Curated annotation (Swiss-Prot):
This is Large ribosomal subunit protein uL10. HAMAP family: Ribosomal_uL10 (MF_00362). Forms part of the ribosomal stalk, playing a central role in the interaction of the ribosome with GTP-bound translation factors. CDD domains: Ribosomal_L10. GO terms for molecular function: large ribosomal subunit rRNA binding; structural constituent of ribosome. Part of the ribosomal stalk of the 50S ribosomal subunit. The N-terminus interacts with L11 and the large rRNA to form the base of the stalk. The C-terminus forms an elongated spine to which L12 dimers bind in a sequential fashion forming a multimeric L10(L12)X complex. It comes from the Bacteria. It comes from Staphylococcus aureus (strain NCTC 8325 / PS 47). It holds the Pfam family Ribosomal_L10. The gene is rplJ. One of its GO terms (biological process) is translation. Belongs to the universal ribosomal protein uL10 family. The keyword Ribonucleoprotein applies.
Length: 166
């Protein structure tokens, strides 16, 4: 009997560590998905560097309490799977949101970003954001635009002076 309790405590510690170390977590209800659809979802999440596991709600509830995350209890009903990302804050939300658009059976329940519980709508909003690399490239193009425009202006002035000299 105590071996089972120890195993459960170890599982709670493991889940708490995953929740603490992840930059984003998405909680979903996977009822109604076929095995093939779940396999497809898992492979998409794996490609994005996201871990996807099914846990008992009681274990997640205790782990969230241990990790200092409050407000998850109301979302931990029915079959629950958790997708966590420890590197890219939008990866889990992006893959889950995209998959949920194509598969109505996948229901986004909630999420956790940087220790704060977010709603399903907020998860979908985060999922529509560009990735970190996309945001960096947008920032770089915005920073390069004034320099590029200045270079074009200098080039145009130079060409205009050449035409006037002739």
């Amino acid at each position: 009997m105590s071996a089972i309790i120890e195993a459960k405590k170890q599982l709670v510690d493991e889940i708490a560590e995953v929740l603490s170390n992840s930059v984003s977590t998405v909680i979903v209800d996977y009822r109604g998905l076929t095995v093939a659809e779940v396999t497809d979802l898992r492979s998409q999440l794996r490609e994005a560097g996201v871990e996807y596991k099914v846990y008992k709600n009681t274990m997640v509830r205790r782990a969230a309490e241990k990790a200092g995350i409050e407000g998850l209890d109301e979302f931990l009903t029915g079959p629950t799977a958790i997708a966590t990302s420890s590197e890219d804050a939008v990866a889990a939300a992006k893959v889950i949101s995209g998959f949920a658009k194509d598969h109505e059976a996948l229901e986004i329940k909630s999420g956790v970003m940087e220790g704060n519980v977010i709603t399903a709508e907020e998860v979908k909003t985060v999922g529509s954001l560009p990735s970190h690399d996309g945001l960096v490239s947008m920032l770089l193009s915005v920073l390069q635009a004034p320099v590029r425009n200045f270079a074009y202006a200098v080039k145009a002035i130079g060409e205009q002076k050449e035409e006037n000299a002739e």
